[in-house]
Amino acid sequence: MAVYTVLDKRELAQIVEDYGLVKLVNATGIAAGSVNTNYLLETPRGRHLVRIDEVKSELEVKRELDLVLFLRKHGFPCPQPITDRKGRHYREHDQKCLSVYRYYDGHPVRPARISAGLLENIGRVLADLHTIGKSYKKGIDNRFSYERIADLYLEVRSKLPSYFKKIVRTLDDEVEYLQNYLEGKLPKGIIHGDLFHDNIIVKGEKVVAILDFEAACRGKFIFDLATAVNALCFDGENYDLKRFESLITGYESLRALSLAEWDAFPNELRFSALRFTITRLRDFFLNPVDEQARVNKDFREFYERLRILRRERDGGMEGLLMAMATGYDYRKYQKVKALEKKGSK
């Protein structure tokens, strides 16, 4: 249950009054999520979400709010924080930051029912985020750079049980490999960093809202796209080539990948899988969390993806590599043609 800070009916009614929502009709703690406390409020002015940040500092909360307000100003479908009667987007509650957001009707993406049309729309929305975010000038520290993940792994590694020897060997090898083969000089800007099924609210094939900007930072666009591929194009056993092609088609309808990005794509997929394997191992072995959250955030989901991406087991990697090679060759062809056209003038 993701309700770590309990609010009684009186406290919830006071929040409703302070945010000008008339009166509290009903309130429900939300079980989804594993980091923050969330309540769904029903009021005469619609449904709203109360969020209490359990781990973020006030500065981190302010940075996240600044970003979502910027994105909303530019028409991006993301959470809409509302202000209280004093004009504040967040307030203090029990030494934590509390904020209230408009609630979006719709439902999270259902992995088993994800269609080609929906994947194209998700790809397009992600490219829109990257395009809009290029003009965001405020810095947001990247908590998931290679250096930080490598440091985190050293911390986690010392806590892993002895029967994890095989997993440790794989992770040791992957951390060393990526240190030498991750490309740093790639297009960067604001990225979401955590584009999973439950962070995408949809109605039919329309993307209503992208949620959860807690991991958003300035980073490589191709890493963000790789994370979306790992989250949305894996069917539980294999990477689905048709899903991959649909997601990329939607993305490139707004923003074409560069040659360097196509070239870096396989390693960014591996780094994304490594990142979530390590952070979930941390959550399991280092952080005290709800038992249900342990089940929902099983590190093995991404460890198995990593094994496929390393070609240690079958799972559709060959198809992805072929598609990425084709994308690289086509982008190269486009570049050559553009140069020829320019030279003929």
Predicted regions located by residue number:
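ATP-binding pocket architecture of kinase catalytic cores
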Residues: 43-136
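Conserved NTP-binding catalytic cores of kinases and kinase-like/nucleotidyltransferase enzymes
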Residues: 1-85, 203-206, 324-345
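Terminal low-complexity/disordered tails
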Residues: 144-146
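Active-site acidic catalytic loop and adjacent metal/ATP-binding pocket
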Residues: 34-44, 49-50, 81-82, 176-223, ...
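An alpha-helical support segment within catalytic cores of ATP-dependent transferases
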Residues: 7-18, 137-139, 150-193
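All-alpha amphipathic helical-bundle segments outside canonical DNA-binding/catalytic cores
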Residues: 117, 259-269
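Active-site activation/catalytic loop segments of kinase-like enzymes and analogous catalytic loops
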Residues: 222-256, 272-288
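ATP/Mg2+ or Mg2+-diphosphate-binding catalytic cores
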Residues: 155, 276-345
